[in-house]
């Protein structure tokens, strides 16, 4: 029996980037995509990319269109970097109006377009929601 094939597109969470014990970013050897693949016996091609936004995913889509078209499912995890702000600008001008890297309207339009492009390639898009941000200090005993 053939393994279910998945292509994963997204940002550093998809890639499995963590802050290691030396306070440096590195790719975890237990990324959640690897765990899903092992637990559900799926072949997952992970094209997550550090810092990726919905605007930059069109290049990734073009580069991996063949993999997507041969995948049963395509996991999409975007939004974490899109909703980020220019924090230096906010610190320098805290009373000004500030907008995220990608506005809601643009994000929605580009995400809907991405979903349709994946469908057009013959894969079923699966949208993955961002995990909640929980400070490590909020749970010191865990």
Residue ranges: model-predicted function:
Residues 1-48, 64-70:
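Serine-esterase "nucleophile elbow" of acetyl-processing enzymes
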Residues 6-9, 13, 32, 36, ...:
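Generic hydrophobic secondary-structure signal
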Residues 12-15, 52-54, 81-83, 133-135:
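Active-site loop signature of alpha/beta-hydrolase-fold enzymes
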Residues 16-27, 48-53, 89-101:
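Acidic/histidine-rich helix-loop elements
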Residues 52-62:
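Structural motif
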Residues 62-142:
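Alpha-helical cap/lid subdomain in secreted, periplasmic
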């Amino acid at each position: 029996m053939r393994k279910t094939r998945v292509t994963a597109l997204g940002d550093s969470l998809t890639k499995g980037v963590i802050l290691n014990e030396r306070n440096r970013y590195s790719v975890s050897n237990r990324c959640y995509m690897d765990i899903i693949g092992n637990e559900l016996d799926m072949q997952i091609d992970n094209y997550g990319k550090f810092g990726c936004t919905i605007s930059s995913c069109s290049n990734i889509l073009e580069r991996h269109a063949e993999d997507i078209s041969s995948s049963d499912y395509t996991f999409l995890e975007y939004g974490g970097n899109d909703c980020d702000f220019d924090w230096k600008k906010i610190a320098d001008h805290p009373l000004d109006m500030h907008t995220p890297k990608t506005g809601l309207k643009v994000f929605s339009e580009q995400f809907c377009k991405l979903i349709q492009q994946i469908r057009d390639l013959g894969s079923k898009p699966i949208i993955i929601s961002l995990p909640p941000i929980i400070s490590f200090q909020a749970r010191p005993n865990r």
